[in-house]
Amino acid sequence: MIIGIGSDLIDIRRIENSLQRFGERFVNRCFTDIEIAKSEGRKNRAASYAKRFAAKEACSKALGTGLAQGVFWKDMGVVNLPGGKPTMQLTGGAAARLQEMLPVGHRAAIHLTITDDFPLAQAFVIIEALPVAPAEGTV
């Protein structure tokens, strides 16, 4: 069952301005080490950071908190599954909020799609609660 949906649309030029104005301070405040390594290795790093920024905003909306109630920028990070599909890795307050949302006997699956077409970057997050299969031999 779907327990959270969030979306965000951002102007890439806004991120370009933040990168120029605040540099590492902005990057280190908002992004995880994995996101920084991925974005710094890209030809268009502003678009890469913008997609990840939009993903964090969308995820915070799917959590139902926004960037409040103990959920911080670096608690949410875009990571890629082995096949390359992006998803969100949650820690700290974001992970705690996700656990609060989950019904008993369920685990979370976070679905993420990110895209950009200058000057815009967009992200959608769906949080799904999936039933945990009972262990063998239990009733």
From Swiss-Prot:
Belongs to which family?
Belongs to the P-Pant transferase superfamily. AcpS family.
Which GO molecular function annotations are given, in alphabetical order? holo-[acyl-carrier-protein] synthase activity; magnesium ion binding
Please report the name of this protein according to its UniProt entry.
Holo-[acyl-carrier-protein] synthase
* Location(s) in or outside the cell: Cytoplasm
Cofactor(s) this protein requires: Mg(2+)
What job does this protein perform?
Answer: Transfers the 4'-phosphopantetheine moiety from coenzyme A to a Ser of acyl-carrier-protein.
Record keyword Cell membrane present: no
The intrachain disulfides are: none
Residues given in the record as Mg(2+) binding sites? D8, E57
Q: Which GO terms describe its biological process?
A: fatty acid biosynthetic process
